[in-house]
Amino acid sequence: LIAVHYADPHRENFQTGRAKALHDANIDYDVFATSFYSFWHGSPENLTNVLKTIAETYHKKVMVAEVSYCTTLEDGDGAANVVNASTSPLNYSIDPLGEGLAAAVRDSIAAVSAVGEAGIGTFYWEPAWVPVGNYAGAEESQKAAILASNIDKWEKYGSGWASMWSGPEGGGYDPGVSEDRSTHGSQWDNQAMFDFNGKALPAINVYKWVYTGAEGPVQVSSVDTAAYTMNYKD
């Protein structure tokens, strides 16, 4: 199957406009794919509406080509993460077992399924992009050494969006690769389906659970803090 892949399903008429342009230009393809990150791309309901419109109007299969969610706001390898405490909205729970991650994946699957037979599935991106060396789990006194070790490995082997050899600094082809090394490490390690030591999270079973269902123990995953101001004179 030939697929085209776009982002931003939340933008009004953006993807439907792209689908129309492809149709008008007689572009031959089979699958219209989209990214769907809940912190950027709107609601699952809107996603269903957009994909259903494209599927029914242009008789294409549709899918989610990228979905993910974070299990922590910590930086696993010393390369600043794309999704962090300033990202909004983070509308699922953030927990080390991946409950919020599993819910985000489940909702994306449900959104595609609601399209009907034209909805063919989802891909998770990127489930195995774990740190080279665990920067977050190190003692404060060890972090500088671990980061230096990570940088050496990133530059030699590549780990992030690109290694230095693909950019101007290394005589490569991509001017978008930064010399400050901000593209070299994993900026997605807090959204992997594995912890910072490479151990699979329970949430990796979500692709089985959407068919079988699952029950988990009732437990406290987070506690909201509240602040009150009182005027004792009144």
Where are the predicted features?
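Glycoside hydrolase catalytic-domain groove-lining segments
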Residues: L1-A3, N13-P89, E99-G100, R106-A114, ...
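Short, internal active-site loops enriched in acidic
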Residues: A7-E12, P127-P131
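Aromatic-rich peripheral "rim/lid" segments of glycoside hydrolase catalytic domains that contact
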Residues: T53-E56, T72-T87, D95-A103, F123-K233
